[in-house]
């Protein structure tokens, strides 16, 4: 997460969350191991079964319970549970299926704006159980590691197969730029500063190294800058990247929200 601005700041800045919310995540930290086991237990067929992922797998992992006017009420039984994924299952499911088909060759995963860490954990584990030769995972956020992140990193350190790196900083920090140049992450999920300039800077930060760049909130009434930026990037990056969009909506929600946009460097296309 880079410097947030405007109304999106209160949504994204976990430093503003009350202490009881941190305690909730501390209480839920044991679920991290359960989630890892659940992901690892999936069969290859289940990993590309979009209907199964949408209706069973993702709701069971637990969904976000903030800004519920943006959330489909039919998913209420999953709100405020587990990994607290701030995603629509009908967007995340086809994205995960796509990722399962494109995980080969990925050695490092970076998330800009990891916040509580649920999505970071899901994607990192999804990659390493879907054929990626994952050697390093990098989480970036200006807040200190949350209970989810701390628990996950402890597990990775115990296993000693994947190097976990946490950078507590804004993505505009020169130190972050130096680390990116050194670590050269080849798959990056951008969900930090939702201003036009901030999201574009994050894209440029990783473009030279990443074979896959994914942007969040590309089809959201609440995030006009990132929505517009995705449309522009889709055109500007067309000579080098193929674009894939996951923007399904729920009729029960008034408006369009969230949205995942993935870009894969054409030279890396399978």
Model regions and ranges:
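Rossmann-like AdoMet
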Residues: 1-87
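S-adenosylmethionine/decaboxylated-SAM
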Residues: 6, 75-270
């Amino acid at each position: 997460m880079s410097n947030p601005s405007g109304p999106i700041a209160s949504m994204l800045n976990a430093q503003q969350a009350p202490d009881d919310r941190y305690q909730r995540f501390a209480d839920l930290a044991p679920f991290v191991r359960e989630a890892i086991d659940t992901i690892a237990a999936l069969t290859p067929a289940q990993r590309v079964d979009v209907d199964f992922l949408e209706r069973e797998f993702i709701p069971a992992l637990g969904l976000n319970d903030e800004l519920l006017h943006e959330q489909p009420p039919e998913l209420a039984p999953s709100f405020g549970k587990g990994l607290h994924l701030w995603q629509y299952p009908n967007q995340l499911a086809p994205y995960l299926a796509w990722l399962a088909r494109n995980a080969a060759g990925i050695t490092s995963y970076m998330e800009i704006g990891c916040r509580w860490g649920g999505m970071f954990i899901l994607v990192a584990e999804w990659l390493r159980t879907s054929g990626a030769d994952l050697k390093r995972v990098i989480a970036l956020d200006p807040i200190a590691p949350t209970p989810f992140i701390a628990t996950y990193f402890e597990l990775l350190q115990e296993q000693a197969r994947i190097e976990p790196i946490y950078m507590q900083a804004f993505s505009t920090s020169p130190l972050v730029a130096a680390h990116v140049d050194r670590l050269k992450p080849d798959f990056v999920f951008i969900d930090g500063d939702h201003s036009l300039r901030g999201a574009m800077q994050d894209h440029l930060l990783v473009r030279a190294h990443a074979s896959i760049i994914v942007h969040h909130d590309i089809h959201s009434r609440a995030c006009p800058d990132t929505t517009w930026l995705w449309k522009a990037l889709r055109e500007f990056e067309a000579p080098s990247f193929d674009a894939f969009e996951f923007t399904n909506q729920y009729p029960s929600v008034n408006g369009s929200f969230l949205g995942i946009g993935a870009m894969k460097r054409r030279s890396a296309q399978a």
